[in-house]
């Protein structure tokens, strides 16, 4: 999902004092256009129990000066639950890959969090950076049908106004069946009777119909 390129408007007015008189100038209006834009995309848009989600964060610099000393922070889908804050995703260690203009770079400093933090990022002038990493759903990931996880990445540092981007993944919908077969008694006497038991479990979020 794309982050928004923001534009800030500022005004300025001069005042001239001479003797007992005061003269105000017109109001000059200017615009500041952010040169960084961020997008965040999940490679797979659905998730399941104990599933891995691969995220791709892209940062583009439309300016003519490199942006250095940036930090990329991911809230890992944190959401309010009563008075608590639950985090449904856990960063998978050693999965960060950092590319500058498509070329793989040395892995930057990573703090697993939450929030996940990747620091020491530099975006070349007129260039782009891509950061790829994996997160795993944990016990706080909602699994009911139509549940979703929305997480936000924030790019900050280097004297810039923080830039954010969001991505939403949806819980996989459908039955998830397992079957276990057992036999009793064990051991059985010759010409004895065996009883087979089948246990079918559905750990999915919808019923399994015939």
Q: Whereabouts are the PLM-identified features?
A:
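Exported/extracytosolic protein signature
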Residues: 2-210
């Amino acid at each position: 999902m794309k982050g928004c390129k923001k534009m800030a408007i500022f005004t300025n007015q001069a005042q001239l004092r001479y003797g007992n008189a005061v003269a105000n100038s017109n109001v000059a209006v200017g615009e500041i256009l952010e040169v960084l834009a961020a997008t965040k995309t999940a490679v797979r848009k659905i998730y399941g129990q104990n599933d891995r989600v691969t995220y791709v964060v892209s940062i583009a610099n439309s300016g003519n000066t490199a942006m250095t000393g940036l930090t990329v922070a991911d809230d890992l889908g944190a959401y309010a639950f009563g008075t608590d804050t639950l985090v449904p995703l856990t960063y998978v260690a050693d999965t960060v890959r950092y590319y500058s203009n498509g070329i793989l770079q040395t892995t930057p400093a990573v703090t697993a969090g939450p929030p996940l933090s990747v620091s020491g990022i530099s975006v070349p002038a007129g260039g782009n950076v891509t950061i790829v990493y994996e997160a795993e759903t944990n016990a706080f990931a909602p699994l009911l049908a139509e549940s979703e996880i929305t997480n936000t990445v924030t790019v900050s540092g280097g004297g810039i106004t923080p830039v954010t981007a969001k991505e939403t993944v949806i819980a996989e919908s459908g039955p998830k069946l397992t079957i276990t077969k057992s036999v009793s008694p064990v051991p059985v006497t010759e010409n004895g009777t065996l009883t087979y038991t089948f246990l079918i479990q559905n750990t999915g979020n919808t019923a399994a119909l015939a």
